[in-house]
Swiss-Prot record:
Additional facts recorded: Present with 6420 molecules/cell in log phase SD medium.
Protein family (similarity comment): Belongs to the eukaryotic RPB7/RPC8 RNA polymerase subunit family.
PANTHER family to which the protein is assigned, alphabetical: DNA-DIRECTED RNA POLYMERASE II SUBUNIT RPB7, DNA-DIRECTED RNA POLYMERASE II, III
Keyword Transmembrane helix: no
The species this protein was found in: Saccharomyces cerevisiae (strain ATCC 204508 / S288c) (Baker's yeast)
Chief place of localization: nucleus
Superkingdom of the organism of origin: Eukaryota
Localization per Swiss-Prot or TrEMBL: Nucleus; Cytoplasm; Cytoplasm, P-body
Entry's Gene Ontology molecular function annotations: single-stranded DNA binding; single-stranded RNA binding; translation initiation factor binding
Main function: DNA-dependent RNA polymerase catalyzes the transcription of DNA into RNA using the four ribonucleoside triphosphates as substrates. Component of RNA polymerase II which synthesizes mRNA precursors and many functional non-coding RNAs. Pol II is the central component of the basal RNA polymerase II transcription machinery. It is composed of mobile elements that move relative to each other. RPB7 is part of a subcomplex with RPB4 that binds to a pocket formed by RPB1, RPB2 and RPB6 at the base of the clamp element.
GO CC aspect terms: cytoplasm; nucleus; P-body; RNA polymerase II, core complex; RPB4-RPB7 complex
InterPro entries (UniProt xref): NA-bd_OB-fold (IPR012340), RNA_pol_Rpb7-like_N_sf (IPR036898), Rpb7-like (IPR045113), Rpb7-like_N (IPR005576), S1_domain (IPR003029)
GO BP, one annotated term: transcription initiation at RNA polymerase II promoter
Protein name as it appears in the record: DNA-directed RNA polymerase II subunit RPB7
Length: 171
């Protein structure tokens, strides 16, 4: 699910960057460090909103090397998946144990135990696929998956998905 979240980040700035364009440099550094990153607590930070209203607090000089530390407050669009959420994605790998679906920046693994009984793995096809009388699920197939559980790590989020219910599976 997508959220708008108020966040903050401490940015350390070397003295060589002190000057009239310091705020511009801090904003650029914020975008480089934050956009596309993942925090286990908030999820994937997709983009920073309202670039002109990023709040840069007063800096604090660090006693060790003369660098300054700034607390930068900003608003961002965040993607955080939840158990029970239904998402669309693209199959990126397929094996006898299940297949993996890319949903934005996150990967969802669908094990064969969470697929309908009539889907069978066909290793002889190129590329490998799951087939039934109605559907074929192979690499690059568009698929609708229900998230059964999420695993948050420091720099990524992985999920387990199911296509066993109605209206789930190949699109």
């Amino acid at each position: 699910m997508f959220f708008i979240k108020d966040l903050s980040l401490n940015i350390t700035l070397h003295p060589s960057f002190f000057g009239p364009r310091m705020k511009q440099y801090l904003k650029t550094k914020l975008l480089e460090e934050v956009e596309g990153s993942c925090t286990g607590k908030f999820g994937y930070i997709l983009c920073v909103l309202d670039y002109d209203n990023i709040d840069i607090q007063r800096g604090r000089i660090l006693p060790t090397d003369g660098s300054a530390e700034f607390n930068v407050k900003y608003r961002a669009v965040v993607f955080k998946p939840f158990k029970g959420e239904v998402v669309d994605g693209t199959v990126v790998s397929c094996s006898q144990h299940g297949f993996e679906v890319q949903v934005g920046p996150m990967k969802v693994f669908v094990t064969k135990h969470l697929m309908p009984q009539d889907l069978t793995f066909n290793a002889g096809s190129n590329p490998p696929s799951y087939q039934s009388s109605e559907d074929v699920i192979t690499i690059k197939s568009r698929i609708r998956v229900k998230i059964e559980g999420c695993i948050s790590q420091v720099s990524s989020i992985h999920a387990i998905g199911s296509i066993k219910e109605d209206y789930l599976g190949a699109i």
